[in-house]
Amino acid sequence: FSPDRCCVVVRGERLCAALQHLPYTLSLWGGEEPMSYWAGLSTYPEERGRGFMGALMTHAFTLLCRRGFLLVSLIPAEKSLYDYYGRFGFETAFYCRKYLYEINGVLPASDAVLDNTFDSEWLSGEWCRLTMAYSCRVLHDTDDFDVVRTDVRLAGGDVWTTSVAGTATAVAVVVPRGDSLIILDICADGEMAMVGIISALCRRYSPRRLLLSLPDGSEVGEILPSLLSGIALKSSEREASGMTRIVDAETLLGRYADAYPNRTHTIRLRDDLLPSNSGIYTIKEGRSGKQPLSLSGTDTVCDYDFDVRALTRWLFLEKIDMAPYMSLMLSE
């Protein structure tokens, strides 16, 4: 907790609404961009329906933009809240795929040796290296992994690695639940390393079922039964795992233009909640220029006519091969 990372609404002596904004980094288009993650959004029950949370979010958007954040992300506490946050410009951008396997035989022996004695600095570096194939992902530093390890251990699980000569070949964050083993996050430097750590985990925990979360677009989950005898895929489901909101469209589109210098687009963007985002953007030869809507008129021919949610879908879902991935946010 830090006071400068909280926004609150106080009425008299009552705390009416609050949110906590935490700094993270998002890998995007080959670079890294600042992202604020929101947690603990809440309104005192007797004060709901009075617009306090909406006013609080709008204030926080402006504050975080001034602090240099381009994006704000959150994980709705329940599905019904996706529509609510959508009213404030959030769009579902993060997806994962959940796999359920049944273990119906004896798994083959593996040479993989599980280890949980490493320090978090080494772990965060190895995790970032192993997830570099994910073109858009939320990154975690040493402090994050300190918290993750403490949290999963309190739940009876742990963070496990396999390695060769001091270099991690796989990392898995797991929590046992009944006769199931939940793998909250897993990454490896190849299919066989993935198979090795899963086999070793199953030998350690002896589950009857395996629940595995992977980035949407990863093919490993589908082919895992063909690589590891003794397990059978029972279900596979794509799930929304988070929303994001653009708070600095001008800088973000500049980053996009720099990453794709051969692309040319003209975009009309309207953002009623954050008018500073509105404008006509011209992306050409690695640069992005902006014209205010008031000066460009409504007759300007554009390739795209977006509100902020449509721009988010275009940038994060249509222009990225693998859906953006956000994991280990302590939301499960």
Residue positions per predicted region:
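Active-site/acyl-donor-binding loops of N-acyltransferases
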Residues: 88-107, 188, 199-332
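Amide-forming acyltransferase catalytic core, primarily the GNAT-like/NAT-type
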Residues: 91-192, 199-200, 250-261, 265
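Conserved GNAT acetyl-CoA-binding A-motif
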Residues: 57, 64-77, 205-216
